[in-house]
A protein has these predicted regions:
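Extended, folded cores of ATP/NTP-driven motor/assembly subunits in large transport
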Residues: 1-403
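Hydrophobic positions on the alpha1 helix immediately C-terminal to the Walker A/P-loop
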Residues: 451
């Protein structure tokens, strides 16, 4: 018998006591402030790890993930038991209403909120409505807490490193998070009522188990009753000789409250090799005895029985795995606890789960008269009360793959559709990303503008954030007005004027605001004179004159009159240098000539919460200047919002226009870098992807964006994007000849296929669609 297994079984032994209350049936003796618990004679700690896109990866990527997961299993401590738990829980109505649905505010936009909430509710109803959490619980026998704490510090570093290689990560849970797991399991439907503060509980003399225990717990022969629900624990009795890596994901897809646990006990390699060699000697002895019996019967040509030959071959292969293929011997068992409202439903669910197992040639059986031990094994206490272990190698354990597909369901996020694999809602909070800026890319008709408008609508209806749009094709005006925003038409014939020299409080954020305005004037002048025509003398004059016209304004503490372009040109004309006269002549067209739309004081209220800059009628001559001036105006607004504590969303449609001109591309790139520090997120969209990819600035912005929506792509663009963004061929199939609203999202390092189909029978769809026949 293997000593490690004997020691592990011994550590699980505990004197039997009849529980006198529900609290006493929960096998936790002590909890410590750092999240370590004492259960029986063992200490345990739990980590949460994230799902990864295993099911969506190419065969080569899956092999790499499988190898990395094998490495993680090989790194598990041999003197401890590791439990991998997949926790399926249904999202209850109260949670859904609080975390996803929009609250009405008693204004004229409530009708839109009600319509959007109907869409979200319908989409949630179409999904399996599951939230899936994944945990690792490590339990170890130690003499005291200090030894246990030292052990878990080492395990924490190993798990973080090995699961980090999988891009999953492992985060240790504190008492609040660990107790919440059990509270939500024992008291389904009361998730929002959980509150626990260790210091407060100690002060009041409360038992921590009071906060998580069910109202009642009664164990029967083949099921248990718990607080008005019934449950049952199953265990994996018989393994197939070959198991597909999708079995665990199929079981965990079951649309009911369920916990699936895999207990793993690695054996030290030297001990495992000795055990297997001993088994081989035993088999060889059996074969020798069989041959002696045959020889005694004068049967010298008989072949060794197939069973013995097969057993010898498999055992030698197992030894070869241990000694040459970096495999570990692992004892493992699988348990499932599932819940239902009635016994009839429970029996039906049990049959369904057993059928899923039989599809993989695996037999799940009910634990009879062991439901309590089974429950304590399946839940992430760190206990292993069921002894139905199976001897596996690292690879055969890794086939019980806990990974499937990543879910994005951030609190306070924006709805972007549903996960194409799991059908769960995709809700992303871009404010939590390292860089909240993003791109929406797709050919004409792929749903690019609709996606932008949908995000704008969601933000407008569910938050107090400010929204600013740059609209080159006059597609956002109707939606802006419906959301009570302001549409500002920027053209030579428009009554609206923008003063590019406006400065708001907070402009510059630590930088020299006059120097920034000087850079703006240099870009405007060079666009009029031609790229490369602005020399060092010109730049010095521009910088000097810009500083001069702001002198009185700065001296007054920002309370005086803000200068305008005519003030700047007059200052230039006063300079004695010949280059000053060249600048004055070059600026005449847009200061005093027919294109003088920016030579006035700003004459509209830009402080509306939602603002759309309409550039549709802007001619080619002034378009580069207009793009820079609008960005400068937005930068002013973003700076003011930052001081006021307001978040700003900036949406730029047809962003390729910026990349056509050197200075506007550079200005956009500066805003892209600067706005993150200003509490602002930019979103740029374009259908002219090939043209954007010719710009090094655009490529740099794309590669450094944490958020991307890729819709249907042209063949030439797919190859370039796959190379630039490191997206596999399998993943790119989700943007190849797909319908509008279908595609890929890249959120941080996660790549998720999505479907975003909005109902066409509502007012919101008509406001957001760009299809003429759907208006």
């Amino acid at each position: 018998m293997i000593k490690t297994l004997i020691a592990a079984d011994r550590s699980e032994r505990e004197r039997f006591r009849i529980p006198r209350s529900v609290q006493q049936s929960i096998p936790i003796q002590k909890i410590y402030r750092d999240g370590i618990w004492q259960t029986g004679g063992k200490f345990s700690r739990t980590w949460r790890f994230a799902d990864i896109n295993y099911a969506l990866a190419s065969h080569e990527d899956q092999r790499d993930m499988f190898t990395a997961y094998c490495g993680a299993l090989n790194s598990l401590p041999t003197d401890a038991t590791t439990k991998i738990t997949i926790n399926n829980r249904r999202l209850n109505g109260a949670d859904f209403q609080r975390s996803v649905l929009m609250r009405e505010r008693g204004d004229s936009l409530d009708s839109y909120r009600r319509e959007y909430n109907r869409v979200l509710t319908d989409k949630a109803a179409e999904s399996n409505d599951l939230i899936q959490d994944k945990y690792i619980t490590v339990s170890v026998a130690r003499k005291n807490m200090d030894e246990a704490r030292t052990f878990f510090h080492r395990v924490d570093a190993d798990l973080s490193k090995n699961f980090g290689r999988l891009e999953s990560g492992a985060k240790a849970l504190d008492n609040q998070d660990r107790l919440r797991i059990f509270h939500d399991f024992f008291r389904p439907g009361e998730e929002e009522h959980f509150r626990f503060d260790l210091s407060d509980a100690m002060k009041k003399g409360h038992d921590f188990r009071d906060y998580i225990c069910p109202d009642g717990l009664c164990f029967k022969a083949d099921h248990f009753e718990m607080g008005g629900k019934v449950g049952r624990v199953l265990f994996l009795r018989d393994y197939a000789s070959y198991i597909k890596d999708e079995m665990i994901s199929k079981l965990s897809d079951f649309p009911q409250n369920l916990m699936l646990s895999i207990d793993i006990l690695p054996i030290p390699t030297d001990e495992a090799i000795r055990e297997v060699q001993s088994r081989i000697l035993g088999i060889e002895a059996d074969i020798a005895r069989w041959q002696q019996r045959q020889n005694s019967r004068n049967n010298f040509t008989a072949s060794i029985p197939y069973e013995l030959e097969q057993l010898r071959t498999e055992t030698k292969e197992f030894l070869d795995d241990l000694s040459t293929r970096d495999q570990r011997m692992i004892f493992a068992n699988v348990t499932i606890v599932h819940m239902a409202d009635t016994l009839e439903q429970l029996n039906t669910d049990t049959e369904t789960l057993q059928a899923i197992g039989l599809e993989q040639a695996c037999q799940f059986s009910v634990l009879r008269y062991q439901q309590e031990d089974g429950l304590n094994t399946a839940l992430p206490y760190g206990l292993r009360r069921i002894k139905t272990t199976r001897t596996l190698t690292t690879e055969s354990t890794a086939v019980l793959m806990p990974f499937r597909v990543q879910e994005i369901q951030d609190a306070g996020g924006i709805y972007y559709g549903v996960n194409a694999v799991s059908k769960n809602l995709l809700i992303c909070n871009r404010k939590k990303l390292l860089n909240p800026h993003g791109f929406v890319l797709g050919v004409s008709g792929s749903g690019k503008s609709f996606s932008m408008k949908e995000a704008i609508t969601f933000i407008a209806l569910s938050t107090n954030d400010d929204i600013i749009m740059i609209d080159a094709e006059r597609e956002y005006g109707e939606l802006t007005r419906a959301l009570q925003g302001a549409v500002l038409e920027i053209s030579p014939s428009s009554p609206h004027h923008i003063n590019p020299l406006d400065i708001n409080r907070g402009y510059g954020a630590g930088e020299n605001p006059v120097a920034m305005k000087s850079e703006l004037m240099m870009s405007i002048c060079e666009q009029q004179m031609g790229v490369g025509q602005l020399g060092a003398f010109h730049k010095s004059i521009i910088d000097r004159c810009t500083a001069n016209i702001y002198h009185d304004f700065i001296k007054s503490g920002g309370e005086g009159r803000i200068p305008t372009l005519p003030d700047w040109r007059n200052e230039v004309k006063r300079q004695p240098e010949r280059e000053a006269q060249e600048l004055a002549l070059a600026s005449e067209l847009f200061v005093e000539g027919s294109l003088n739309m920016f030579a006035h004081e700003t004459n509209f209220d830009i402080d509306n919460r939602i603002v759309c800059f309409d550039l549709y009628e802007m001619g080619e001559q002034l378009k580069p200047t207009a793009l820079n001036v609008v960005l400068e105006t937005i930068q002013n607004r973003v700076a003011a919002n930052r001081l006021a504590g307001r978040y700003t969303w900036v949406f730029v449609d047809e962003v390729y226009l910026f990349f056509k001109y050197y200075y506007s591309a550079q200005f956009l790139y500066k805003c892209w870098k600067r706005f993150r520090k200003y509490a602002a997120a930019m979103t740029a969209a374009t259908q002219n992807i090939e043209e954007c990819l010719r710009s090094e600035t655009a490529r740099l912005m794309l590669a450094n964006s944490e958020f991307l929506i890729l819709l249907n792509q042209a063949a030439t663009d797919r190859a370039e994007l796959a190379k630039l963004l490191h997206i596999s061929e399998t993943q790119m199939s989700h943007v190849t000849n797909v319908e509008a609203g279908h595609g890929l999202m890249r959120i941080g390092s996660s790549i998720i296929p999505f479907v975003n189909e909005f109902p066409r029978d509502g007012t919101l769809y008509r406001l957001m669609t760009t299809t003429p026949g759907d208006k």
